[in-house]
Amino acid sequence: MAWKLDNDRPIYSEIVEKIKLRIISGFYQPGSKLPSVRDLALEAGVNPNTMQKAFAELENSGLLITMRTSGRMVTEDEERISMVRETIAQEKIDAFLQDMRAVSYTHLRAHETRH
């Protein structure tokens, strides 16, 4: 999965979002071990400290768990993952609807366009 970073907000925030998407899409399965901070930083083309900051935020959100001797793993709490999936989906729907309203595109017009 490519790491396209937009630079329109803090890099670590973009990394958090991309890793969340990898988790909710199943790219990283519940209970699976993540690559090391260094490996992911190299893959993403960012400083390891930036990746570490993103991992810390993901740990605070409950999506990642640190295992002292075996690195970081995706939580096995599928309810937590599902909740994050629903939150992200709702945010994307809200942003889309806001964009459509900004260009005066109504629900009726959208429905008519589809048929």
Language model feature labels by segment:
Residues 33-44:
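A short alpha-helical element within helix-turn-helix/winged-helix DNA-binding domains
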Residues 1-8:
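N-terminal intrinsically disordered/low-complexity leader segments
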Residues 34, 66-73:
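Short, Lys/Arg-rich nucleic-acid/phosphate-binding segment
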Residues 78-103:
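Conserved segment of winged-helix/HTH DNA-binding domains
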Residues 26, 62:
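Glycine-centered, phosphate/nucleic-acid-interacting loop/turn motifs that mediate DNA/RNA or nucleotide
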Residues 106-115:
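Conserved small/polar residues in nucleotide/adenosyl-binding loops
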